[in-house]
């Protein structure tokens, strides 16, 4: 008769800061976090509960993940965006289908990296919230530059039409505003969390 000498357990390990990453996403304005996984329902539900995921969809084949993303895309609002984070070769179709595909690059497959819109090279999921904050700051700066340039140019145009400003003001409205916009844009380089 044989006697057991031990067990071998094979499992995926949850990234150490995954829970903090999900909290960071929610703090950054993400309304709903859905986990799509091929894992068994019991395991997926336990991991989802541990991480604070809003919804778990488990036992999915790669094609099923695409179908689930299609359902999520159909259910979202017109101005809402759907982001998908993945690292495996099986995630490539979903990464390319999502509005924003984010690949975890250091351990990610080449197919996932190629299909993604954003690649995080250090596999730290907390960087997703940081990337969102940087993009929001960058968009604010772009909007500021556009409004500033239009206000100055239209003011010089209107004042020039009635004869209050000369050619030097027009040069300032063109070159000076461009230089100020570039200097304003450099603020995006000094991002601090």
Predicted region positions:
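Cytosolic catalytic headpiece
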Residues: 1-100, 133-136
């Amino acid at each position: 008769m044989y006697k057991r000498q031990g067990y071998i357990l094979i499992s995926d390990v949850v990234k150490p800061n995954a829970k903090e990453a999900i909290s960071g996403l929610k703090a950054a304005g993400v309304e709903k976090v859905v986990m799509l996984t091929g894992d068994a329902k019991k395991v997926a539900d336990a991991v989802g509960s541990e991480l604070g995921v809003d919804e778990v969809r488990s036992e999915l084949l790669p094609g099923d993940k695409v179908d689930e993303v299609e359902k999520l895309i159909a259910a979202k609002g017109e101005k809402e965006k759907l982001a998908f984070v993945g690292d495996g070769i099986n995630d490539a179709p979903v990464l390319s289908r999502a509005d924003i595909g984010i690949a975890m690059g250091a351990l990610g497959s080449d197919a996932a990296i190629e299909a993604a819109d954003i690649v995080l090279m250090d596999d730290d999921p907390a960087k997703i919230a940081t990337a969102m904050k940087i993009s929001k700051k960058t968009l604010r700066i772009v909007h500021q530059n556009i409004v500033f340039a239009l206000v100055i140019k239209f003011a010089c145009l209107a004042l020039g039409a009635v004869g209050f400003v000369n050619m030097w003001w027009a040069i300032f409205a063109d070159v000076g505003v461009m230089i100020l916009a570039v200097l304003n844009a450099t603020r995006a380089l000094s991002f601090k969390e």
